[in-house]
């Protein structure tokens, strides 16, 4: 069991509340949001400097904190949490016409388990984020991004490698963490939704039946603390419409699907016209076929996997043939680091066109949450950079390439 946490910042929300209507209508309004990736859950490709400073064996937050030790890890991560995001970022999001921010958090923020090398302290900053978002008029979707044992084997779960979630007590431990998260935050009108777990990997071995049981338990926890909060379920890398008929009652369940074009050998080889056709087809075939609201909770402007460490620290890229034994499609030298200002005019125009197509496609259903707000330099992935460069529309309705879907 995880220890009970009390409020430690200037405000505190009641854990027992009268039911309220959702503070956002996911059936009627369009979600227009961005993720705060790489902040409270680290990813090597978003902040490579943190991982490079710890040596070659630091490939995820687990190994990073294990190598550094508790004291040094607390010092370095606290400095990162304090400096990476500020209140001004949330105002910039609002000024760009966004209405949501999705904030990943790991189970260890609620209290690391015995034997974990992780450090906690993230909740102080999540509290600040909710406050800043509310002041800017944004809604928050809190996302449980990492579960004990790893639900997908990706470094963004905290620990890459084997999928061990659903083994031993890991599901019960996850529910303990989720309960504490819900108790702490679901009293805030700013927190419109909470996500049960990020990217549970059914093709990779997560049992769908047990996942559905977990989703049911999460639904009960949310009802316990605030029946008006929407519950977000990841599609588990299955077609989102395959979840039709599951938890369709009422209007509080929202499905989350993630759509990327660089982790598939067929998609990554496409030209820009084919990328746009594919994203429009995805929306018509899958999003519009769902019986529940669906947000595309992760997507981006990049069409290659060239960003440094995107496939994991120490791994290469499909695009230039350095990942596994894939055939090279192109050159990653201008796409691995840096910002979109160094791209050619044609590359920036194609990226804007692709972004606009995705905005159109995803708003055929319930909307979108871009991945991610900020990086140390990953062209196409950094919304703050894309906005500044005019590659992402400065208002979500602005179009240089209208009606692509």
Swiss-Prot record:
It is found in: Secreted. InterPro entries: Glyco_hydro_5, Glycoside_hydrolase_SF, Glycosyl_hydrolase_5. The keyword Manganese applies. Residues 1-14 form the signal peptide. Induction: The combination of poor nutrition conditions and attachment of mycelia to a hydrophobic solid surface appears to be a major inducing factor. Gene3D superfamilies: Glycosidases (3.20.20.80). Keywords: Carbohydrate metabolism, Cell wall biogenesis/degradation, Disulfide bond, Glycosidase, Hydrolase, Manganese, Metal-binding, Polysaccharide degradation, Secreted, Signal. Disulfide bonds join 280-405, 306-332. It catalyses: Successive hydrolysis of beta-D-glucose units from the non-reducing ends of (1->3)-beta-D-glucans, releasing alpha-glucose. Its main location: secreted. GO terms for cellular component: cell surface; extracellular region. GO terms for biological process: cell wall organization; glucan catabolic process. It is an enzyme of class 3 (hydrolase). Its cofactor is Mn(2+). It comes from the Eukaryota. GO terms for molecular function: glucan exo-1,3-beta-glucosidase activity; metal ion binding. Its EC number is 3.2.1.58. The active site is at residues 199, 298. Monomer. Belongs to the glycosyl hydrolase 5 (cellulase A) family. PANTHER family: GLUCAN 1,3-BETA-GLUCOSIDASE I_II-RELATED (PTHR31297:SF1), GLUCAN ENDO-1,6-BETA-GLUCOSIDASE B (PTHR31297). Beta-glucanases participate in the metabolism of beta-glucan, the main structural component of the cell wall. It could also function biosynthetically as a transglycosylase. This is Glucan 1,3-beta-glucosidase A.
